[in-house]
């Protein structure tokens, strides 16, 4: 029975979604923690928008 609890906990940890991947980024701290930059108006060339930085018109941009 204890093996089932251990198996369940490992499955829960490995199948848990990663933060910042499935949820939208909406503040500068989360943006910077994900390795991205905050940029006004639009993302620079070769960057992809992955969220916003909290202020209107400010985008969270990351290199793919």
Swiss-Prot record:
Keyword annotations: Antibiotic, Antimicrobial, Defensin, Disulfide bond, Secreted, Signal
Predominant place of localization: secreted
Membrane-spanning segments: none
Disulfide bond positions: 31-60, 38-53, 43-61
InterPro entries, per the entry: Beta/alpha-defensin_C, Defensin_beta-like
Signal peptide: 1-23
Function: Exhibits antimicrobial activity against Gram-negative bacteria and Gram-positive bacteria, with highest activity against Gram-negative bacteria. Antimicrobial activity against P.aruginosa seems to be salt-sensitive and is reduced with high salt concentrations greater than 25 mM. Also exhibits antimicrobial activity against the yeast C.albicans. Permeabilizes C.albicans cell membranes via targeting plasma membrane lipid phosphatidylinositol 4,5-bisphosphate (PIP2), thereby leading to cell fragmentation and cell death. Acts as a ligand for C-C chemokine receptor CCR6.
PANTHER family: BETA-DEFENSIN (PTHR20515), DEFENSIN BETA 4A (PTHR20515:SF2)
Family: Belongs to the beta-defensin family. LAP/TAP subfamily.
Protein's recorded name: Defensin beta 4A
Source organism per UniProt: Pan troglodytes (Chimpanzee)
């Amino acid at each position: 029975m204890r093996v089932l609890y251990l198996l369940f906990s490992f499955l829960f940890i490995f199948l848990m979604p990663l933060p910042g991947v499935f949820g939208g980024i909406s503040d500068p701290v989360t943006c910077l923690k994900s390795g991205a930059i905050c940029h006004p108006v639009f993302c620079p060339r070769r960057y992809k928008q992955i969220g916003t930085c909290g202020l209107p018109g400010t985008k969270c941009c990351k290199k793919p």
